[in-house]
A protein has these predicted regions:
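Periodic small-residue-enriched repeat registers in elongated scaffold domains
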Residues: 1-145, 149-154, 246-250
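Short, low-complexity, polar/charged sequence segments that are solvent-exposed and flexible
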Residues: 186, 250-254
Length: 254
């Protein structure tokens, strides 16, 4: 293919326009402008993606991978460790390391985790963060969403328990703002989702433009139809447009 080539290595193919395989063994690079940098049996079909390691697959564009046996199908993603996956609808996500982990949302970072599929007595543990956003222009509460706007509930799978820290910051059109922190624990027992105890809500600081006393903006977490919703409540007495952003940090055990 035009502009493609291999430099060193063994039995590798560079088939995409401007693609390359450099000192790589048995790799196949068919994505345009993609490159395999050393490694073994790397398969790259995503445009402008790159990777190292062995037996990794990258179908997402503008992505990078390392480690072994990983699959990166989300665009603008990053995947490392061993046998980890970034899903196709999870753009802008990353797995920093660990074993047998899979992303759940777009804009998610799995910092580390470990899933032992051979011994059911070994706990699955993971530490992850998902980034959040919302825009409000009225006085009604609204559900915050993932950064790509596609998901508005954050529920552990059956058999899992999450210890959660939620940070949300709001900024009004007049550049006034506020910030909140919420800590809570949620479990899923055979489809029945429960928040254990009461979420701890701390208003870290809040400008009066976001309301005062009973009219002040706030954040709530609750279970509706066995799904966890995070609601941002704008100022109640008058509509003030606001941008809301934050992240949900999860420590997960199953």
């Amino acid at each position: 293919c035009e502009g493609a080539g291999c430099g060193g290595g063994l039995r590798s193919r560079a088939r995409g326009q401007g693609a390359g395989a450099v000192f790589s063994a048995e790799s196949d690079v068919s994505g345009a402008y993609a490159i395999a940098l050393g490694g073994y049996r790397l398969k790259i079909t995503g445009t402008a993606s790159a990777g190292v390691g062995r037996e990794n697959t990258c179908n997402g564009s503008d992505s990078f991978f390392w480690g072994r046996g990983n699959t990166s199908t989300g665009n603008y993603s990053y995947t490392g460790g061993y046998l980890n996956t970034v899903g196709s609808s999870h753009a802008h996500s990353r797995v920093d390391g660990g074993y047998r982990l899979t992303t759940t949302w777009g804009g998610e970072t799995i910092h580390w985790g470990y899933r032992d599929t051979e011994n059911s007595n070994t706990p699955y543990v993971a530490h992850k963060t998902v980034y959040l956003r919302k825009y409000t222009a009225g006085t009604a509460a609204e559900k915050i969403t993932t950064i790509d706007g596609t998901v508005d509930t954050f529920t552990p799978p059956s058999g899992y328990i999450w210890a959660c820290e939620l940070y949300v910051t709001a900024r009004t059109g007049a550049l006034r703002g506020g910030a909140w922190k919420i800590e809570y624990v949620v479990q899923n027992v055979s489809g029945t989702v429960t928040i254990l105890g009461s979420p701890t809500v701390v208003a870290l600081g809040q400008d009066a433009q976001l309301g005062t006393a009973g009219n002040a903006s706030t954040i709530t977490v609750g279970v509706v139809s066995n799904a966890v919703e995070i609601n941002v409540q704008p100022r109640l007495d008058t509509a003030v447009s606001a941008k809301w952003g934050g992240y949900l940090e999860i420590r997960e055990v199953s």
